[in-house]
């Protein structure tokens, strides 16, 4: 079934619920899941050889040509992946000391965006699911991030982890 972590699409990493991640009741605070999604995404990208913040993007020449007329494009190019949407649904509580398997896969890819799906499991039991949408952007000092196309080389590596169609 699409969405199950047995699919080869899923990348898995582990996170231990630290004391700082819990609330007064000793249960993981809802916000901890957002940090875990971001750190899992970063681990996933590192594994694929993709920088989270890239000062020398592989498509630098085409970016410079495409953006030649844009304001604020100087000698330094910095490309990153800001979040534009995040959500989580919680199924069961996790506590200090629990070990979570965090699974990440690609649900969709647009021209400049990626939608990730996350599954959190504790001892094989589903405890939460999440979604994060990121957009590849040119980051310009003092200016709004500018969405830019995901280059083919990056797209190929990421799409190897796309979930099967439902």
Residue ranges: model-predicted function:
Residues 2-84, 138-166:
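Hot-dog-fold acyl-thioester-processing enzymes
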Residues 2-8, 90-99, 106-166:
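HotDog/MaoC-like acyl-thioester-processing domains
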Residues 71, 84-90, 101-103:
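Short structured motifs
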């Amino acid at each position: 079934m699409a969405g199950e972590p047995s699919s080869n699409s899923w990348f898995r990493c582990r996170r231990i619920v630290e004391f700082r991640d819990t609330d007064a009741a000793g249960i993981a605070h809802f916000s901890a899941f957002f940090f875990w999604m971001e750190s899992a995404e970063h681990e996933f990208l590192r594994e694929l050889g993709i920088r989270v913040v890239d000062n020398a993007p592989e498509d630098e020449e085409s970016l410079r040509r495409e953006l030649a007329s844009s304001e604020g494009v100087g000698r330094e190019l910095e490309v990153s992946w800001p979040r534009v949407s995040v959500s989580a649904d919680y199924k069961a509580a996790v506590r200090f000391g629990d070990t979570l398997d965090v699974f990440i896969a690609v649900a969709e890819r647009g021209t400049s965006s990626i939608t990730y799906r996350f599954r959190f499991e504790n001892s094989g039991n589903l405890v939460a699911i999440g979604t994060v949408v990121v957009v590849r952007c040119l980051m310009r000092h003092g200016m709004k991030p500018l969405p830019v196309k995901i280059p083919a080389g990056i797209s190929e590596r990421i799409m190897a982890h796309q979930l099967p169609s439902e």
